[in-house]
Amino acid sequence: MANTYKSIAVSIIFLLYFSCVSSQQQTKFLNHGFLEANLLKSGSSKIHPSGHLELTNTSMRQIGQAFHGFPIPFLNPNSSNLVSFPTSFVFAITPGPGAPGHGLAFVISPSLDFSGALPSNYLGLFNTSNNGNSLNCILAVEFDTVQAVELNDIDDNHVGIDLNGVISIESTSAEYFDDREAKNISLRLASGKPIRVWIEYNATETMLNVTLAPLDRPKPKLPLLSRKLNLSGIISEENYVGFSAATGTVTSSHFVLGWSFSIEGKASDFDITKLPSLPDPLPPLSPSPSPPVSVMKNSSNTMLIIIIAASAIFGILILSFLAVCFFRRTENFTGGARKFSHQTISSATGGFDNSKLLGEGNSGSFYKGQLAPTEIIAVKRITCNTRQEKTALIAEIDAISKVKQRNLVDLHGYCSKGNEIYLVYEYVINRSLDRFLFSNDLPVLKWVHRFCIIKGIASALQHLHAEVQKPLIHGNVKASNVLLDGELNARLGDYGHGSRHSTTGHVAPELVNTGKATCATDVFEFGVLIMEIVCGRRAIEPTKEPVEISLVNWVLRGVKSGNLLRRCDKRIKKKNLVSEEVLLVLKTGLLCVRRSPEDRPMMKKVLEYLNGTEHLPHDDYVV
C-alpha cells in the first residue's frame, strides 16, 4: 500500500512538473532580431533585412507598433492571481534632423485597438480624451526624449512608469548604476547606441523594477526605477505585450534589436553576437550656406553637374541590379503563374534540406524557403508519375494562381524540373491548425478564434465553389491544410493541383465508390473539420471507447441524448464559450456530413447559417 501511495505521489509530481513546463513553453520567447518572430505590426513599423525592428523612421507624426502574436495569460489558472513576469529588450533611438522625438514604450494592453490614439507625446497609445482613463487598463514603461510640461515630464531624457495614460506615476532621468564605481551614470536615450532594458514584476511583493544599461554592460545590481504597484486591477487575464513609438514635429528612428519575455521564471538571456546591427546613422545637417557671392558661381555650377551625373549613374546601377534580380528569379510568366528557376528554389530551401521541412503529405512535401532577407516562402514538392499528369498539373496551376481571396493561401508561382513540380506559396507564420487542435505544446485556441476560423474556411470554400470563373474543388479539407496567420485568421491551402487524398474519417461515402471529388465531398469534409475544431479531437481515434471512436457518431449521440454542448473541447474555459455558437457549428457540421450528397447544404447556405442570416432546419440533423 505504501508503494502504491509513493507511485501516486511520484505521478502527481511528474504531472505537475510537465504541466509547468508546458505552460512555460507557451509563455516564453527569445528573439535575436525579428525576421521569423511572430509579431503583429501596425502603422510605420517594419522589419529590416538585417532583422531589426523599426517602429518609426524620421518622418513626422508617425505611429509604429509591434506586439507579440498571441495574448499572454497573466493570471495563474489555479488561483486566478496575477503572476510574476520578467522581460528584457534592446532598443536604440537615432534622432532625425534637429532634436529627437518623441520616444517609445513597452506596453501591456488587453486590446490592440488603439484607434484615435495620437502620435507625439501620446506615443500612439492615448489621446486627449482617454488619457488617464482607468478603463484603458494599460501599463507602459516609456522612454521619452521630449519634455512635455503639460504632462509633468521632468526632462527630455527620462524613463517613466505609466498607468492608463502618459502622465507617469513614477519617472526619473535615464541613467544606470555602475557596480564598479558604485554610482549612477547618465545615459542618453537618443544617442543612436543600443541600450538594454530589464522590466521585472514580482507579483508576491507587488514590485515593479526597471533597469537600464548600455548593451555591452552587465545588468546593474540596482534598478533605475522601483515602484510598489499592485497590477491586479490593471492587468486582466490575457494581454498583448509589445512596443509602441511615435514622432511629432521632431523625429527619431526607434529600433528594437532583440526581445526576451517570460511568465514566471527568468527571461532568457541574449547572445549579443546574434543581435542584428543598426543601420548607419543619418549624416549631420550641414550648416546653412552663406549668401551666394559671384566668385562661387562657377564652383556651384560644377558641383551641381557632378551631383546630377552621380545621381543618374547611381539610378542606372540600381535599375540594372533590379532587372538582373528579376530575370534571375523568374524565367517567364504563363497565364498568371510565375515560373521560378530551379536554382532559385533550391537555393531558397537550402537544397531542400531536412531542417527546412515543414511537413509531408500524400501529395508532396512542404519546405520553408527564403527568396530574399524579408521574403519567406513555403515550397511544395510534388513528384509526377506520368507526363500527362505533369501537363495537367501545370494547366491547373495557371488557374489556381489567379484565385485571390483573404482566406486562401496565395500561390506565387511554380518551378518544373524533370518529373517534379515545385509550388511556391506565401509562408503563413502560425502554420497549420492541427498543431493547435491536437497538441498540448501551443496555447489553447479561444472560442472566439475557433468560430472566426470556421467562418474563414467556409468563406474560402464558397469562393472556390462559386465565386471563380470555373469552380475549383479542394479535395482535401482538413486541419493540416488550414494555416493560421499572425492574427489567427484561417488561410485554406493546398487546394487544387491533384491533392485528392482525403484523410480517414473525412471521406464522403460516395467518394469511396466513385473516386470523384465534388463540391458536395468538400462540404462533407468541411463538416467533419468544424466538428474537430469545436471538439478538439480527431475524426477517428481508435484508442477511445467504441462509441467514441468516430467523432461524427459521437456528436450525433450528443444530439440524441441532449448533451451536445458537452462535446465541446474541455480545454476551452467556460466563461469564454458562446453556447449558441457552439451548438450552431455542431448542428451545421451534422448537416454537412449527411449520407446523401443531395441533402448536404451548399457552402453559400452554410455561410448564411454561420453568419446568422438563415436559420437551421428544425432538429433535422440525422446523418
Swiss-Prot record:
Residues 1-23 form the signal peptide. It comes from Arabidopsis thaliana. InterPro entries: ConA-like_dom_sf (IPR013320), Kinase-like_dom_sf (IPR011009), L-type_Lectin-RKs (IPR050528), Legume_lectin_dom (IPR001220), Prot_kinase_dom (IPR000719), Ser-Thr/Tyr_kinase_cat_dom (IPR001245). Pfam families: Lectin_legB, PK_Tyr_Ser-Thr. GO terms for molecular function: ATP binding; carbohydrate binding; protein kinase activity. Residues 352-616 form the Protein kinase domain. ATP binds at residues 358-366, 380. Glycans are attached at residues 57, 78, 127, 184, 202, 209, 230, 298. In the C-terminal section; belongs to the protein kinase superfamily. Ser/Thr protein kinase family. This is Putative inactive L-type lectin-domain containing receptor kinase III.2. The chain crosses the membrane at residues 304-324. Residues 325-623 are cytoplasmic. It comes from the Eukaryota. Disruption phenotype: Increased susceptibility to the oomycetes Phytophthora brassicae and Phytophthora capsici. Keywords: ATP-binding, Cell membrane, Glycoprotein, Lectin, Membrane, Nucleotide-binding, Plant defense, Receptor, Signal, Transmembrane, Transmembrane helix. Residues 26-262 are annotated as: Legume-lectin like.
